[in-house]
């Protein structure tokens, strides 16, 4: 190589590292973070809105919310608890006196 042409022939230096044939790790990180955020949003939506909406919809089908809380056991409505009136009061019995009655 003569010195006159040395100015035109400079050594070739790569400007960037060659890329490997695959998905870049930054893209994998973005997908993982977005999936995690979406999962948290869905969980909070369930806690604040969807759980109450499910209870309301099931209650409209004829089941009370107490029945929903205790699961799928059917309530026996054929033998309800009777309303027993309170025993009659004897009026004011007065002060307690030991040794009487």
From Swiss-Prot:
Residues 75-101 are annotated as: Disordered. One of its GO terms (biological process) is transport of virus in host, cell to cell. Disulfide bonds: none annotated. Keywords: Host membrane, Membrane, Transmembrane, Transmembrane helix, Transport, Viral movement protein. The keyword Transmembrane helix applies. It comes from the Viruses. Its main location: host cell. Signal peptide: none annotated. The keyword Cytoplasm does not apply. The chain crosses the membrane at residues 30-50. It is a single-pass membrane protein. It is found in: Host membrane. GO terms for cellular component: host cell membrane; membrane. Belongs to the mastrevirus movement protein family. Involved in the viral transport within, and between cells. Interacts with the capsid protein (CP). Part of a MP-CP-viral DNA complex. This is Movement protein. The lineage of its organism: Viruses, Monodnaviria, Shotokuvirae, Cressdnaviricota, Repensiviricetes.
């Amino acid at each position: 190589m003569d010195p006159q042409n040395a100015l035109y022939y400079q050594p070739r230096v790569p400007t960037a590292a060659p890329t490997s044939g695959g998905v870049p790790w930054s893209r994998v990180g973005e997908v993982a973070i977005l999936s995690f955020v979406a999962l948290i949003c869905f969980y909070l939506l369930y806690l604040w809105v969807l759980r109450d909406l499910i209870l309301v919809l099931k209650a409209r089908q004829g089941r009370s919310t107490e029945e929903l809380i205790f699961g799928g056991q059917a309530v026996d409505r054929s033998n309800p608890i009777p309303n027993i009136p309170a025993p009659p009061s004897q009026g004011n019995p007065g002060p307690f006196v030991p040794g009487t009655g």
